[in-house]
Amino acid sequence: MRQYQFLKIFLFMVMGFCFLAETKAQTKTEVLVIGTIHSGHSNNPNYSYQDILNILGTYNPDVICVEIPPSYFRKQSYLKEMMIASIYGFDNNKKVYPIDWWETLSDARAERSKYIKTDDYKTKSQEADSLVKNNRIMQAFVEKYGTMDSIWKNNKMGYEFFNGKDYNNYIREMYTISIRVYGDGCMNLYSELRNAKMMELINTAIAENKGKRIMILTGAEHKYYFDIALSKQEDVQLVNFEKLLPLKTIVPTSNIIGFIRNDLAKGYYDMSDTSSIGVLYQNALVPLIHGIGMDDNPNIIPVENIRKAISVVAEWESQRSKSAVLQFEKAWIRFLEKDYFGAIKISKSITKKLNELPKEKHWFFVVYYWRNLGFCYDMTNQRDKAIKAYQECKKACKTLGVNMNVAEKYIYKNFENEPYTREQNK
């Protein structure tokens, strides 16, 4: 009888422990870290923006952390896949947290450019090269997949690769060697400091959402660090990406479709801030009529881009916006349409409102306002006015701290002495 009672007590205790263990497991916060490839998603057939959406929908998190600085969040444009994830979150009533962080007191890339010219770098780079050549994990990776440069150049590796063990083990070893040789500094863009600061923001999101499902989207080179840090937290259940496979196909919302196709990020910006309206539309125009080289050589802008830009501006105007930025863009489009007198008329309407243009972008708006006006005057045979506009452009470059060598080569060139013609830029 006593043995029977003892057995009952023992079984009860075992069941109790199992129940407690199961309850504790259920109350853990599930966290999945997803490595992304930033601009690479735009033309990677195996890791597209749609794949980002499929990953989000398959995991269906309660909370989404995105690699956007808090100061930029819902106010300025940032990494496209992070904005897509934000829009997905807002469209589906998810909490979205910005978790990016950068050191603002120094320019690590400028530091690195100077440092790689020193003798100290030459010595340490040889040490780093030796460590890489003798690292079995890194060499096995290169034999299997090729160099990292070739991987990024070909841009065909999929989401399983960037979220798999081989890639993340390689990145871990790469940063371990870099920090061992150079320290946590400009050569690795202060990666340890940045990752630690980002983890602080991630931990805030976790603390405010205990027991929930959280997805962290971050550049693929951060994933190894976050996985290691999160695996050490008792209240966190780190989710393996492989458990999501195969992914579901998620139908995008109209906001996401509009953003992927036309860069019009509706649903992302905080529209209670009236200035966000201008940011929404102006950012949509950037890839259309202000892409690489387009402002310096407008002849490379496709006609289809101009057509799309006209549509964006028309919608912007329907918001009853009277912003100087809108008028700047309208004048630029008129110039692209070869309506030079129309462009001059619009430009002159904001000559006394240039201070209303975004101060952080005066180096662009003010400088190109005068340069573009000079173009229009030259195209309408008003040479004296054109020269004055180019002089104002040069003056603005100096005042706003634009590199004068760059300005002379790409912006105002020699237009004070040689009139601008559309043909010369072809």
Regions found by a protein language model. Give the residues of each.
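TPR/TPR-like (Sel1-like) alpha-helical repeat modules
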Residues: 348-352, 383-401
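Flexible helix-coil transition and linker loops at the boundaries of alpha-helical arrays
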Residues: 257, 265-276, 313-320, 352-363
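Boundary/linker segments of alpha-helical solenoid repeat arrays
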Residues: 318, 323-326, 354-366, 395-422
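Residue-level recognition of tetratricopeptide repeat
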Residues: 332, 368-371, 375-378
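A substrate-binding/cap region within the structured catalytic cores of diverse enzymes
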Residues: 74-183, 324-329, 336, 340-341, ...
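Proline-aspartate-enriched helix->loop->beta-strand connector
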Residues: 56, 60-66, 211
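TPR-repeat structural position
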Residues: 299, 303-306, 340, 383
